[in-house]
Amino acid sequence: MSAIYNFCAGPAMLPAAVMKKAQQELLDWNGLGVSVMEVSHRGKEFIALTKQAEADLRELMHIPQNYHVLFMHGGGRGQFSAVVNNFLGNQGRALYLVSGQWSSAALAEAQKLAGDAQIDSLNIVEKQNGLNAVVLPDLHKIDADYRYVHYCPNETVDGIEIFDELDSPWPIVADLSSTIMSREIDVSRYGLIYAGAQKNIGPSGLSIVIVRDDMLKLPSLTQSSIMDYRLAVEHDSMFNTPPTFAWYLAAEVFAWLKSLGGVASIAKINQQKAQMLYACIDANPFYKNGVVAANRSQMNVTFQLADESLDGAFLKEAEAASLVALKGHRIVGGMRASLYNAMPLEGVAALVSFMNEFAAKHS
């Protein structure tokens, strides 16, 4: 069977080596004679797995000791709610920077749940010569007392990425669902980081939360216990039964990434992949991208065909060439190629070759 390259934005492809290992030990994990899906989450074998997973993630991201690492339910949308409930209190105030669909969704959830708390927002994307560009505000010039400022460094729908680390006088809360471990960041700059697993970590259903000690002292709203960061810390992410199989696969992905040389190594590969695909788009008037070069996402490359009537043919022929899940999000249309850590260079090279051939055939 020839390789199929899956460009889905999430759930995304997992590393082949991880999938093969999971297949091999699916029915007999750690010599126990049962699947990892069947063992107790409080058994010594699974506890050892969780401790190794946290240690590996801390090593990969250089997470300081004054941060807690949580493995939680609910994905990114669950964290939209959890952030508000854990940090705002009844009289708090927060700022949301809006750069695309996902930061807009986080803002909408905050406004829904805030009650007497105040939610402010700033749109940080503007048009420059017809292209979307991020313009970060000088937050130090804003006269306000915010509990936190929230932003999303990578917008999967819009194909926008913010590479400059935010400079803020208030704690930064960041949705890294689609960019976590794709490039190096300074974790110590953040009050809280959260990420749904289904792009660069593992299967859907799991979310990672990295929270600084002092954030847990902020007043909280009345909230559900299952999304209470303080309870999650107290119970080592096991206040209730966690998504154990997703946790297991995340642990295997961390080990795989370490074997490649860590985040610094995969970041170089990710940069190569994105440059290869954007070069193809820029070199051919048959394709167009709507984002300024400085904010083009490395993880989610969005593009349109000059002749939209060929969209269906493009997707059909791409699938026949074993290049799947290239349809853009329903909100923006066009095409989207997601190049998460598990996507090999060979997959992007195959896509570029196909795009050149398709353009030549239909020009």
From Swiss-Prot:
It is found in: Cytoplasm. Its cofactor is pyridoxal 5'-phosphate. Binds 1 pyridoxal phosphate per subunit. It comes from the Bacteria. The keyword Glycosyltransferase does not apply. L-glutamate binds at R42. The keyword Protein biosynthesis does not apply. GO terms for molecular function: O-phospho-L-serine:2-oxoglutarate aminotransferase activity; pyridoxal phosphate binding. The modification N6-(pyridoxal phosphate)lysine is found at K199. Pyridoxal 5'-phosphate binds at G76, R77, W102, T156, D175, Q198, N240, T241. Its EC number is 2.6.1.52. Its main location: cytoplasm. One of its GO terms (cellular component) is cytoplasm. GO terms for biological process: L-serine biosynthetic process; pyridoxine biosynthetic process. Pathway: Amino-acid biosynthesis; L-serine biosynthesis; L-serine from 3-phospho-D-glycerate: step 2/3; Cofactor biosynthesis; pyridoxine 5'-phosphate biosynthesis; pyridoxine 5'-phosphate from D-erythrose 4-phosphate: step 3/5. It catalyses: O-phospho-L-serine + 2-oxoglutarate = 3-phosphooxypyruvate + L-glutamate; 4-(phosphooxy)-L-threonine + 2-oxoglutarate = (R)-3-hydroxy-2-oxo-4-phosphooxybutanoate + L-glutamate. Keywords: Amino-acid biosynthesis, Aminotransferase, Cytoplasm, Pyridoxal phosphate, Pyridoxine biosynthesis, Serine biosynthesis, Transferase. Homodimer. PANTHER family: PHOSPHOSERINE AMINOTRANSFERASE (PTHR43247:SF1). Catalyzes the reversible conversion of 3-phosphohydroxypyruvate to phosphoserine and of 3-hydroxy-2-oxo-4-phosphonooxybutanoate to phosphohydroxythreonine. Belongs to the class-V pyridoxal-phosphate-dependent aminotransferase family. SerC subfamily. This is Phosphoserine aminotransferase. It comes from Shewanella sp. (strain MR-7).
